[in-house]
Amino acid sequence: MGDWNLLGDTLEEVHIHSTMIGKIWLTILFIFRMLVLGVAAEDVWNDEQSGFICNTEQPGCRNVCYDQAFPISLIRYWVLQVIFVSSPSLVYMGHALYRLRVLEEERQRMKAQLRVELEEVEFEMPRDRRRLEQELCQLEKRKLNKAPLRGTLLCTYVIHIFTRSVVEVGFMIGQYLLYGFHLEPLFKCHGHPCPNIIDCFVSRPTEKTIFLLFMQSIATISLFLNILEIFHLGFKKIKRGLWGKYKLKKEHNEFHANKAKQNVAKYQSTSANSLKRLPSAPDYNLLVEKQTHTAVYPSLNSSSVFQPNPDNHSVNDEKCILDEQETVLSNEISTLSTSCSHFQHISSNNNKDTHKIFGKELNGNQLMEKRETEGKDSKRNYYSRGHRSIPGVAIDGENNMRQSPQTVFSLPANCDWKPRWLRATWGSSTEHENRGSPPKGNLKGQFRKGTVRTLPPSQGDSQSLDIPNTADSLGGLSFEPGLVRTCNNPVCPPNHVVSLTNNLIGRRVPTDLQI
């Protein structure tokens, strides 16, 4: 039985490196084979030769008949079966121990490497030091009691299952050929040196038959476990391969999904930052107000409503706002052009080639050249402010004079304009007209072509204005040609529309007339 103990200790190591079905197989091998052979089978088969009795006195005949009846002792046959069936497991155990030792050496080498890295890491790097300590603790806890069943070790395990299954089948076939499934109590033998057919009797044949069937059943169960373990490993291998492909595909899909989410989040953050940097366009009233103040105070800095922004989107917004302003300006120009056409029709009968400024004749060509020069200078100053202002707004004369009394109006050269509140007439030739009657039909004292006059402030609907015709009065007037713009074009262009300014008020001489 000492040999059984050595074999049992060796198979215990195999038990550690086996699968669940392999452990069941080893349990059956230990309990139902080795234990039965060691405890009960020897007692049953101990009197096998002594209890074999033959009806002859011929020397040697009983031994020849016993050899024919029991060519091999079943107890020894079963011992050989256990040894041969366990031998592939011993080979697998040797390979598993070798792999375990290799893994342990690799673990020790990694531990030594981590300790060296941990010693080299400075205390100023706590994150790296903590990471190395965690890896070292994991290596300490990762001490393997058995080698993982993968790679070449898995191949060895499958081969050893096939081998012991083949051995099991061989011993089962051999036992059947030798003894069958039933042991007869009477055995007839003939042969030399027996003179004739000799009858021999087997001791305890029923008990031996039971043991025979029991050992054959244990062998069948072991074979079934071997086949089941092969299917288990194959199914596990296939499942692992399919799961690996599914997991790889899932990780691939998750990677692309996360990448798409990151791109969307990055695009949203970029769009949000761009929207934060975009300046909001002011409304129309605020824009007109800012540009009006800019025209009134030209010495101040230009409005910063549309100052260039480092972001590229601000340029597009500025262009959009300027387009909107130009659209509004075009509408206003159309309205004013209609009014100018009406006044041009009224004053078409009084057109002349000369311009009269308070009784003084000026050459028309010189005045046109002067106006063009002033218009170019004003355009240059106008576009150099970094933004575009609305050149003019259609303003009702009466309402405008009530809102801003200190305003100088610049009319086109070919547009004679007379406010409704102005009851008086202009020029020395119209002083004898009725001052109380409002203009009806044809305007009295209409502006001549190219005539520009400064409008006095209105004191009421019934109040009129008398402009003396003397030279002193004419000489006392201070006229600002740079601030008054006229147009000689039949269709009033945008740059000759009404402009608002207070420069005249700031530079007025005592003799100037106020509006």
Curated annotation (Swiss-Prot):
Domain of life, source organism: Eukaryota
Family: Belongs to the connexin family. Alpha-type (group II) subfamily.
Example GO BP: cell-cell signaling
SMART domains xref list: CNX, Connexin_CCC
Cytoplasmic side: 1-19, 99-166, 231-515
Tissue and organ expression note: Highly abundant in skeletal muscle. Also detected in testis.
This protein's record includes keyword Flavoprotein: no
Region feature (Disordered): 370-400, 428-472
Membrane topology recorded in Swiss-Prot or TrEMBL: Multi-pass membrane protein
Entry keyword set: Cell junction, Cell membrane, Gap junction, Membrane, Transmembrane, Transmembrane helix
Full protein name: Gap junction alpha-9 protein
Cellular component annotations (GO), alphabetically ordered: connexin complex
Biased composition (Polar residues): 456-472
GN (gene name): GJA9
GO molecular function annotation: gap junction channel activity
